[in-house]
Amino acid sequence: MKSIGPKLVIATHNEGKLREMRELLAPLGIECLGAAELDLPEPEETGVTFVDNSELKARASADLSGLPALADDSGLSVDALHGRPGIRSARWAEPGYKVPGAQSASGSPAEGEDEAGTRDFGRAMERVWREVEAAGADAGHDAHFTCALSLAWPDGTVESFEGKVHGTLVWPPRGQNGFGYDPMFVALGFDETFGEIEPSAKRAISHRAQAFRKLVAALG
């Protein structure tokens, strides 16, 4: 695989993802620039898979910055919800987003909106749990996180890697670590949620860490 060089764009505006990805890349000694630092726009995610969207974001950032760019597309897939929210995990946290195929009452049109009108994962977790409850006790609480990681170069070359971690959902959410749906997810073999375990422990087992290990192995 091609080398990255001394600088890399991390194609995300999510501060939690940016921090975690910088920590995972630290051993490589590469200067990591966030998309916001370069004033790069967030492209519309039009793909139908996690890899589709991660490649779209990586290519867009590489084209605009002239630097190699690394993008992540990740999400929570719940068995009882037939894989939802999946690639729309972030959208479930957006103000006014109507959950497709919702079985429970969806609330007011502005549900999910906080005072700043930004993504609210507290309410997104409530949405997920309501849907799981509406699916019935027999549906269970099994779920998994998926991370697709794509590295793109300005010449159009792109390499992608995927990681998954399986577990169960709990309610109410627990812990202040992590971000997104972490406080309601317990990985197999653990008693604490991703919101409770130490960041170093999460980095050892998470879907993102698995994808990063594949990336680092490919870089040699």
Residue ranges and their predicted role:
Residues 2-9, 15-220:
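Anionic-ligand binding patches
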